[in-house]
Amino acid sequence: MKFENKIDQKILQRRERPREEDLRGYYFRDTTAIIHSYPFRRLKHKTQVFFSPKNDHICTRIEHVMHVATISATLCKALGLDVDMAWAISLGHDLGHAPFGHVGEKILDNLLKERGGRFIHELYSLRVVDHLVNYGKGLNLTYAVRDGIITHCGEQFEQEMRPDFEYKNLKKIKTLGSYPATWEGTVVRMADKVAYLGRDMEDAIQLKLIRNEDIPGIVSKRLGSKNSEIIDTLVNDISSVSPRKGAIALSDPVYEAVMTLKSFNYDHIYENPTLAGYHKFFERILTTLYGYLLECFEKYGFDFQKYNQERNMLSLRFADYLKKMHDFYKNMNGGFDNLVIDYIAGMTDDYAIDSIKEIMIPRNLESQLEKFIIT
């Protein structure tokens, strides 16, 4: 089967604000825009699964998205699809992730639920590229890339996936469940899963949470015992099976082994008591930051100078953020529930921890705080 998108290329290449294209082409331009953005740069200091700031060889969020990009590009080459589109979707798919990985996402989601909202990183990644980058202006990406970002949903591992080829109002998507409009987006959705299963297992071994001999036999035999072997097996399987199935798909034996590995990872890694101990710290950090910043905003609103009264760098930086984003939030006509979450979700792990210190530990009199006071 030849994979072709049943949706007009002009729709896929459409931007919310018309612009003259250049020699990079539609989708490679999106790739460079994402790479140059601040949210992409911050991914190198955001947890993937393991909070391990002292170990340079444990996967961070930026390494994960690079794995997704290379896997997606390889599959697109094999299947005759648009590599540039897949690269852009891959690099942008996790820009909306919270600090401290999926645990941080759940914490922010619970905080927003109390105010009638939700925090879902797939949806939030679209908010980042559409609005939060460039002080409310966004990156002005193509429809195809925006669609692939919001529909990448990497948690459910389906054996076969097909695009819906629908032109959707992406801003109205409020829950998971939508499928990509393109084959390239579907490839990224599959590659997201391929990228994390073996790598999470390998990192867990390095951190001594599990041992090599703990890996189920069916996984070692059919997929491999190292991340590189697992990726190689899955990429080759998808490349050979997909044209026959008319879908981005895995064979039955490989899919069985994949689901075994996924169950193993959940039982022995993601729900490991050692990690659960860290989760309590992350909940205290993010909940405290949310409560403090929400209180500040409810007291001072957009009166930026009043944030000086708090006498800490977090409040001053938050005020500076509000000042730069004022036009965007002002045009929302209220509904500021997401405003504090926008700021916290953009934090790196280290910045969140430093911010807690700012509001919990007083500075000495010789500190340089005064030069940052907003005037």
Model-inferred region functions:
Residues 1-62, 67-75, 82-83, 104, ...:
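Histidine-centered, transition-metal-coordinating active-site segments
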